[in-house]
Amino acid sequence: MAPGQRLVLCEETVRERSGLGPHRDLAELRSLSIPGTYQEKITHLGNSLMHLTALKSLDLSRNSLVSLEGIQYLVSLESLNLYYNCISSLAEVFRLHTLLELQDVDFRLNPVVKNESDYRLFVVHMLPKLRQLDDRPVRESERKASQLHFAPEDSLNSKENFSTTLTVGRPHHLRNRCTETSAKKCLVMDADDEAVLNLIAECEWDLSNPPGNMSSSQKEHEADLHYAQESRHLLSPLSIQHQCGDSARRGHEKKKVTSRGCPGHSPQDQLCGELPLQHGLPEACHMHVQHARITSQPDSVDVEDCASSAQKSSLSSQKTVNPLPVPEKYRKRRMPGGRFQVPSDRECLSFLERADGPSSLEDSLSRQDGLEGQSQVALSHSEALEAEERTSHGTSDPRVLSPKLCSAAVPERRSTLEVALLEALLDLIDRCSSGSGSLHGNEAFLAQAKHVLSSLQEFTATRDSSALEKEGIGYLSLENKTLQSRLAEQQQQYTATVTKMTAELNNTKRELDTLRQHLDKSLEENSHLKSLLYNVKKEVKTADTSTALTLQITGLQASMKQLSGEVVELKQHVEHYDKIQELTQMLQESHSSLVSTNEHLLQELSRTRAQHRAEVEQMRWSFQEFKKTTALIPHRSSRRGGRQSC
């Protein structure tokens, strides 16, 4: 077909290709195959498919279709083959959105596959029953990705909405908005939860004592006494034990209201137990946060609550009690909205390390690492039970608070925490020395102590950032390995395909050479026979007897029949040669398409490698700066320790 020629499909061609008689209805047709040939290639469908309402399978491969207008009538179509056509835009692909029964579509070797990066996700999102696209099965992960990529507001129901989506483009904040809405759902507390928390707070964490039993004057007197004691005195370990047990008692009382809790455990099992303050305070605080998270689940997790309380009891019974005063700052504080803020493990641990009086920052950090490791090992069983319970329920409770909410208040509490730790350190030094309040007014000592505390906090934050950087490096290395494996697999596929096509091309060339040799040989024989025929005719003219002439004519006629048969065979060979030449051209075009695809993949890999290299260099530079910072901190702390001893 000449380039640029317009060939529209008509009903006569449909009847001719399908073998349907002129008096039969086109609605009876179930399958239609009209692949393109070297002489004719369809460019437009027109209205030829209007009456094929029951068609299930349509093959229009190897044509030159530039538009799919007219395919919307095939409402029952399940399989569509448009391999090696000229569809170049998603606007034409969008014409398939009315064919809701489509299960198998093939757009390979169409310009739209190469030009549109979101082509596959678009088709998967547009056709809900699609099972196979471009000779590849549609995975569930691709459906989820298409749903995230094309949000519900990108409606495909009208052509106006679709054109707007194509011209304007997708909003960049779409995924962030989806993430924010899902995060908001996880942070919402029911009105019942708010009421229960307010009631427990008003009852002084004891539901047996209603808020109405205490007079206002008595409340004011107790509040004044509490603040007076908090300003200068320290709490005993029993008070800390009581505070850590409040959360467990709150969960136990809430279970009593609904299902009477765990009947096999005593009320003491719901508390944190006696806290071993040398090594157990961080564990107790961590257990308190863990238990608060468990009790905020629905009432259906009684088994998990019992298991966690039993784990806490067994953990507390293995420790020994060593009393040590703890400041009132480490009690859990009530936040606005009915939520409670619990001191973190590092706050409790930093206070204990200063109360025990370690000789250097290295000893403090080593002890903190050991205690955090013990706390994580001791609580692994309860966390596993909690994860198993959440998995069995299938969905997460929206009332479970994210750990990011607890860490959001750390910058605001840093100054108050520093003051509390400094007060505890000064009180301990005053009790150990003869005087009382001797260092509270010493500005030089206060400045040095504050600097030491801030250095410790900066070191802890730097160590956390280093761990995050290591996780990022590990993730990038894993992603790099995945990309390399994918590239190796694609290169193997490309090599196998090229090898196969090269072998087919060589076989075709050999067949062409053989056919040419046969053709040359046949032409030589034909010319030789013609010369013989000419000689025989001359001899016949000069012959005397009619008998000899008759015999010669009979022989010549037989020779002519044989020659005509050979000529027919030669014509068939020539037609076969033309078909082989067309197949060779198509193979060459497919080979060029594969080469361009491979070059595109190599360019993407090089860009990914360059980006990965830049990120690794940035992380290495950050790690070197971190090492320099950590190398300076011990030197400063040892120098200041020498000044204090002087």
Swiss-Prot record:
Keyword Signal: no
Keyword Disulfide bond: no
Coiled coil: 476-622
An MF annotation (GO) of this entry: identical protein binding
Low complexity: bias regions: 307-319
Start-end of Basic and acidic residues biased regions: 383-392
Name assigned to this protein: Centrosomal protein of 72 kDa
Protein source organism: Mus musculus (Mouse)
Organism lineage: Eukaryota, Metazoa, Chordata, Craniata, Vertebrata
